[in-house]
Amino acid sequence: MAAIPSRKGVVVHINVFTVAPEKQQLLVDSLIETVNEARKVPGWLSARVHRSYDGTRVVNYVQYESQEAAQAVLRHLAAGGYLKRNTELGTVAPGQYEVVYTLDSVAGLQT
């Protein structure tokens, strides 16, 4: 399991998508493609894609080194049509956050 650092300056975007169950996997695949493109931009740190068991939600969790890096990634993805495609597959409720605390199981961090 990847650690989520709580260091100063790291910007976190958590996007919660509501999606029709028949489109959930399409959105998951699209978000995976999107984060693989995003990782090419300096300042991008990490991403996670989660799907709900009931098929109606997908959550995308992304970390950036700074606000500037987050904006650069979003501009890059918008120019490539990634953001438009994702929002055509589901309705997104975006949010920007700062990590203030993390706690991990020692066993969960072993590889």
Where do the language-model regions lie?
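Short beta-strand/turn micro-motifs at beta-sheet edges
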Residues: 1-6, 47-49
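An amphipathic, aromatic/His-enriched active-site/gating alpha helix that lines ligand/cofactor pockets
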Residues: 6, 37-45, 63-98
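Short, well-ordered beta-strand segments in beta-rich or mixed alpha/beta enzyme
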Residues: 11-18, 48-77
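Short amphipathic alpha-helical/adjacent loop interface patches that line ligand
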Residues: 31, 35
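Short, low-order "capping/linker" segments at domain edges
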Residues: 99-111
